[in-house]
UniProtKB/Swiss-Prot annotation:
GO molecular function (one): translation initiation factor activity
Keywords, in A-Z order: Initiation factor, Mitochondrion, Protein biosynthesis, Transit peptide
Cellular compartments annotated: Mitochondrion
Organelle targeting peptide span: 1-31
Gene behind this protein: MTIF3
Name listed for the protein in its UniProt record: Translation initiation factor IF-3, mitochondrial
Length: 278
């Protein structure tokens, strides 16, 4: 009996220990769970801060871009928004008024009914000028005319064309029209003429094709590089380019001179014939 009692007591003790372990283990997990989740919970806050900073940076970049565009705007009326405390001022006649506080500048603008325009912001202090509305309008028109007179030219493109020495006249006319379009767009045109198969043709005959093409564009195009042998003498190559403005002007003057000489010569011949008839 005693042995049976001890056995039951031992089993009951083991069950109690297991129950306590489960109970305390569950309690420990409940306590430690929030501590484990706290770094995860703080993550959104960190993400939010980073996002806010990134958004602010992008906004600053956009503002800087807007400021740069405003600074690049040609000849604009500043108005009363003078960023510098002291500026170097010129009046509407171009007279140097020296350094002046912006409050005095605004007062002068009101007294004379003038506008304020930036002249040079890279100096210290920055240079500004008082101008009338009409002066600003005239200056803008002058700047636009200067831009039209000196347009910004992009990089020169090179077009390439390969012809055969035995090309037909119809095909040559078609290719010549294409070359003329490229020349009008100020492109360089590289032309290569290869010797046709089973055709005995001299370099002079091939070079004559280049001159035939060039003669269709008098006063418009000329050789950038003259015809020369390439590919071991199997082909000739040249580069055509458009006339420069000075070349166009010189060509027109030459043509006008020749026309005047021709008219004078014809007029002189008419006089001689009239004298003979008399």
């Amino acid at each position: 009996m005693a042995a049976l009692f001890l056995k039951r007591l031992t089993l009951q003790t083991v069950k109690s220990e297991n129950s306590c372990i489960r109970c305390f283990g569950k309690h420990i997990l409940q306590k430690t769970a929030p501590a484990q989740l706290s770094p995860i919970a703080s993550a959104p806050r960190l993400s939010f801060l980073i996002h806010a900073k990134a958004f602010s940076t992008a906004e600053d970049t956009q503002n800087e871009g807007k400021k740069t565009k405003k600074n690049k705007t040609a000849f604009s009326n500043v108005g009363r928004k003078i960023s510098q405390r002291v500026i170097h001022l010129f009046d509407e006649k171009g007279n140097d008024l020296g350094n002046m506080h912006r409050a005095n500048v605004i007062r002068l603008m009101d007294e004379r009914d003038l506008r304020l325009v930036q002249r040079n912001t890279s100096t210290e202090p920055a240079e500004y000028q008082l101008m009338t509305g009409l002066q600003i309008l005239q200056e803008r028109q002058r700047l636009r005319e200067m831009e039209k007179a000196n347009p910004k030219t992009g990089p020169t493109l090179r077009k390439e064309l390969i012809l055969s020495s035995n090309i037909g006249q119809h095909d040559l006319d078609t290719k010549t029209k294409q070359i003329q379009q490229w020349i009008k767009k100020k492109h360089l045109v590289q032309i290569t003429i290869k010797k046709g198969k089973n055709v005995d043709v001299s370099e002079n005959e091939m070079e004559e094709i280049f001159h035939q093409i060039l003669q269709t564009m008098p006063g418009i195009a000329t050789f950038s590089s003259r015809p020369q042998a390439v590919q071991g003498g199997k082909a000739l190559m040249c580069v055509l380019r458009a006339f420069s403005k000075n070349e166009e002007k010189a060509y027109k003057e030459t043509q006008e001179t020749q026309e005047r000489d021709t008219l004078n010569k014809d007029h002189g011949n008419d006089k001689e014939s009239n004298v003979l008839h008399q």
